[in-house]
């Protein structure tokens, strides 16, 4: 029965992101069947942006929030990219986490920066995006300790597959 159960699982696991679910789809195209979990929309903030542009982007994120055909349409996620300034990155993550009903995606490959950012906003259950073949063990430890989702990068599909396989072997 376990083998049958495994064979009938959707090709992509369902993950919970804030109040939303992603994945768990059994079809690739909407016309094949209805999609089970809707897409989430994200806006990007980056440490490479000046303060005025960051504030303008945050105000724009707040404005995109309306109801259409009985469904709330909004920017559900804020993707915060690290361009090398660790202190500014952590502060930017805090600003993004202060936006209500938004999930923060922490995008950094630097383990120390990731640790500081996750520690600063872990109660908001962000996504830690930045594990790769070189840092996946440390990133996995950070994500597992905080109980959050870990995003993985790879130079190509083969590298991505190998990194994900190593993470699954480690229990993630």
Whereabouts are the PLM-identified features?
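Active-site/ligand-binding-proximal alpha/beta "capping" segment
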Residues: 158-172
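Active-site beta->alpha loop and helix N-cap motifs at the rims of alpha/beta catalytic domains
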Residues: 3-162
């Amino acid at each position: 029965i376990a083998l049958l159960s495994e064979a009938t699982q959707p090709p992509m696991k369902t993950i919970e992101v804030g109040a939303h679910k992603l994945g768990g789809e059994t079809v690739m195209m909407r016309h094949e069947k209805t999609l089970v979990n809707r897409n989430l929309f994200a806006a990007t903030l980056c440490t490479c942006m000046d303060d005025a542009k960051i504030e303008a982007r945050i105000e724009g994120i707040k404005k995109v929030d309306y109801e259409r055909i009985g469904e709330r349409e909004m920017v559900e996620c804020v993707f915060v990219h690290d361009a090398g300034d660790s202190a500014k990155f952590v502060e930017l993550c805090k600003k993004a986490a202060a936006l209500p009903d938004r999930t923060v995606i922490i995008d950094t490959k630097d383990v120390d920066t990731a640790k500081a950012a996750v520690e600063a906003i872990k109660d908001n259950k962000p996504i830690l995006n930045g594990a790769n073949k070189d840092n996946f063990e440390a990133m996995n430890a950070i994500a597992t300790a905080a109980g959050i989702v870990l995003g993985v990068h790879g130079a190509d599909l083969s590298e991505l597959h190998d990194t994900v396989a190593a993470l699954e072997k480690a229990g993630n």
